[in-house]
Amino acid sequence: MTRLPNRLPRMILLIGVMGALLGCATQKQHTFTYSQPLLPEVASGYADKPGWSSKKFAVAAANPLATDAGYQILKAGGSAVDASIAVQMVLGLVEPQSSGIGGGAFMLHHEGKPNGKMQAFDGRETAPLAASDTLFIGKDGKPMPFTEAVIGGRSVGVPGTVWMLELAHQQHGKLPWATLFQPAIALATDGFKVSPRLNTLLKNEKNLKADPVAAAYFYDAKGDAWPVGHVLKNPAYALVMQRIATQGAKVLHEGDIAQAIVAKVKNHPTNAGLLSLQDLANYQAKTRVPLCFDYDVAPERYQICGMPPPSSGVIAIGQILGILNNTQAPQMPLNASKQPTVDEYLSPEWLHLYLEASRLAFADRAQYVADPDFVKAPLDDWASLMDPLYLTQRSKLITDTSMKTAKAGLPTSVRAIKTSVNNRYAPMPDQPEYGTSHISIIDADGNALAMTTTIEAAFGSQQMVSLNQDGKNTIGWISVEQRINRFQFRTNWQRRQTDCQPGRTRQTTTLKHVTHVGDR
């Protein structure tokens, strides 16, 4: 966990990273020239990180090349949002299995000045206008197998990551927009070394070769994944980066690139999709009001803020912590040996309470949380799900034995709704979720952001678009539109709050938080 100087708000950004670079000084001029690091660290698998300390700025991302791009932007005087753009564009190139310009993202941004504003930016994908709640029902009337639904055009929706970044930059950018694409352009043009992680994923992927463009880009003539250290170039990605840099996010949503994306989706030989030029042209990123709750751990009071629905993370965390506070958990040791060491296993007693609280929270999440543009919150306020009195009632359901499958609760405002059969929602079943990356950044002015960016499944919908006919120059990934994992595979009698509807954003588990300690 990165520690911040006292003059800045003390925050905790929940991150999942493999690399971090910290800066101890920054330049005042707002100019930037990208230089590629000579020996970037690459890794595959888990690496324990002890944490770092910085007095000026910090950036953490899942790939050292992306982290370095953000670091150089911050060192040149860029803002946290500036750095996030550079990081994301490089991630889309070097880690296409996790995120990219064809995906969706959330960003939580906090201004570093006193009483600074916190904002939530929503760039998650939406369902095509032609979508319906039977999109993932097969000809036999049964839900499609997950893999069959995902791979191809059917699962692709309207991407929003670049639109969201442009919106955030308009409000919080310092360096010129075009400057921020230099790292991705340079790496795509000159090439980057295939990492062990990318090589491993390519070798284990069974379906990616079915797409001729992806096969030509990621595999050699024998069909083997490019080896670790192979220099992979993508001049067409560089071209698209250059066009976004000079023309803005709109180049992905209109004109020849948009036409190529739509053609790829609609012309899939076995699993065509519904994405249209109108869908791309109509997309708008949104700003939302962050959702916050208080959490007391003597002698401190924490205010924890997160992304509101359609993200479900902050509600789930708020419920889990609130329920646990009504149990013996706060007085119990965390580990089995009753010693405050990090090397011990969690005690069975504490872990039982945590798991039961999590069951209750996820039951409510499955029942109520969805796109707020389509589904009303209980009491018209999502915070009602974290009401202390309600969580006290929920905590009484925990006993010494597992409740197995928990049932959703009934906040007061929901009781009237539940009496109407026509308005009754079935709970949302869990489904696998992969293909996601996280970015955490603090700039020299104390502005902080947490951004989760995703294409939902490994390599998204496993469709790649080419700018030419030979299939060698590619523009990047059309993501598996994230609704595939939360818009439901369901039979007609099961009405759910996450049903697929035109223009709708599905519920997501992505989690990004900023925590204030007292008045810091």
Feature map (PLM): residue ranges:
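Bacterial N-terminal signal peptides that target proteins for export
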Residues: 2-13
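C-terminal motif of bacterial Sec signal peptides marking the signal peptidase cleavage site
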Residues: 22-23
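Noncatalytic scaffold domains of N-terminal-nucleophile
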Residues: 28-68, 72, 80-248, 252-254, ...
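Internal maturation/activation junctions in enzymes
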Residues: 36-38, 331-454, 468
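Feature captures eukaryotic membrane-trafficking machinery centered on endolysosomal pathways
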Residues: 65-68, 235-272, 418-477
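Active-site rim segments in enzyme catalytic domains, especially the processed small/beta chain
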Residues: 93-100, 104-110, 114-120, 271-276, ...
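Catalytic loop of the DD-peptidase/beta-lactamase superfamily, centered on the K-T-G motif
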Residues: 301, 307-312, 321-327, 453-458, ...
